[in-house]
């Protein structure tokens, strides 16, 4: 099946493409489809924002569309940055600024209170009344410094055991990540 991967985030698009193509789908990016659209994410949950994006891009592309909304939820910060993960340091800031803010916020938090999880909600829209939603999560901890060169976003700070997401190669990350788990659940539902 040809699928529109509804993301303007290069890192997410790379993961969506890698996982969906392994599932046998041909993935078209927004750039491939010449779609220049940035729907406002007004939802208060990952699921609501994923659905907003999936519906908008399905309508624009005319193709079955898979969108995700995901982020980092840190226990010691009452779930922050959560749905505001991409904008944690403010509008117009990048991953480096978000990571720097997270490190500042976590500076005095002891090791035993550094639990966090990446959360992902995937929404697949095939038409007006044909919508499938799945979620995935990955438990970990927040490091005290950046680790690794792979990945994107908060990956250099998110530790699973002794390694950060940014120290894992793509297939190793996909096997345990929030996005990999959400897409695996979607695959099972679609079978």
Residue positions per predicted region:
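Anionic-ligand binding patches
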Residues: 2-4, 10-29, 33-191
């Amino acid at each position: 099946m040809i699928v529109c991967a509804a993301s303007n985030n290069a890192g997410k698009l790379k993961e969506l493409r890698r996982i969906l193509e392994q599932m046998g789908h041909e993935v078209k990016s927004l750039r491939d489809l010449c779609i220049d659209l940035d729907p406002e994410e007004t939802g208060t949950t990952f699921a609501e924002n994923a659905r907003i994006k999936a519906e908008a891009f399905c309508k624009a592309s005319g193709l079955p569309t898979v969108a995700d909304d995901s982020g980092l939820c840190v226990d010691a910060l009452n779930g922050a940055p959560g749905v505001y993960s991409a904008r944690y340091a403010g509008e117009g800031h990048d991953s480096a600024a978000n990571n720097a803010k997270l490190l500042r916020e976590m500076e005095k938090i002891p090791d035993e209170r550094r639990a966090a999880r990446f959360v992902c909600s995937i929404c697949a829209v095939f038409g007006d009344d044909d919508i499938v939603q799945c979620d995935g999560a990955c438990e970990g901890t927040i490091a005290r410094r950046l680790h690794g060169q792979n990945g994107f976003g908060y990956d250099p700070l998110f530790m699973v055991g002794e390694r950060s997401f940014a120290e894992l190669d793509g297939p190793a990350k996909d096997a345990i990540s929030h996005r990999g788990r959400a897409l695996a659940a979607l695959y099972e539902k679609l079978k």
